[in-house]
């Protein structure tokens, strides 16, 4: 399991445990699973997928460390 926290400038969008997270990276979408290597990556416009949810974003960054995933994102407005 992963501990996921998604933060936007307005609020904490999600905080909880998930089995995986898919994010839009600079070189394409990638999936983060348990025991993923530590990483910091820029996110591009796309969709973050987690626990059956989809969150459209304009960009941001992701940090993975010891099964903790932190996303700081700018949300896409409807």
Give each language-model segment a name.
Residues 2-78:
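Compact, glycine-rich, soluble single-domain proteins
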